[in-house]
Amino acid sequence: MVRFTLYQVNLYTDARGNKLIHTILQYLNENLSKSTLTLKKIAEINYVNPSYLSRIFKEVTQMNFVDYLATLRIEKAKRLLQTGNLRIYEIAESVGISDPNYFSKLFKKYTNMTPAQYKEEIHRQEDF
């Protein structure tokens, strides 16, 4: 889902000549492990008003900034749960969330499973 959105954004920003969102999406992907990623901080880095950034971000991605960032984090966490032997708190930290309890709640909100349930389901599918 996120990759498709990135593709759409590339087409949109190239067509309009507006590289701001494309630049921000690249920054988010490259800095996902930082817990300081906020709309306000990203707006400051790019010298734009947070309200303007919020509006244009949603226009381009069809998602608000918070949901987009959470989706990126959850997708990366899912990959880490599938491929690694990291503990939940290590995965949380690697996607920029310092509180493992909050990470578990966020993960469940977006996947309807806890990280442990997701990992168990992946291993169950691999056994078949």
In which residue ranges do the predicted regions lie?
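C-terminal alpha-helix/helix-terminus motif
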Residues: 9, 111, 115, 119-126
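Generic hydrophobic, amphipathic alpha-helix propensity
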Residues: 20-24, 28, 69-70, 74
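Basic, amphipathic alpha-helical hairpins
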Residues: 3-13, 25-37, 57-61, 78-86, ...
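Conserved phosphate/pyrophosphate-binding and hydrolysis machinery centered on Walker-type P-loop NTPases
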Residues: 11-21, 36-39, 46, 97
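Basic/polar phosphate-binding segments, predominantly the helix-turn-helix DNA-binding elements
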Residues: 40-69, 94-114
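Short acidic/polar alpha-helix capping motifs at helix-coil junctions
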Residues: 2-7, 18, 51-54
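Terminal helix-turn-helix DNA-binding modules in bacterial transcription factors
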Residues: 59-98, 120-128
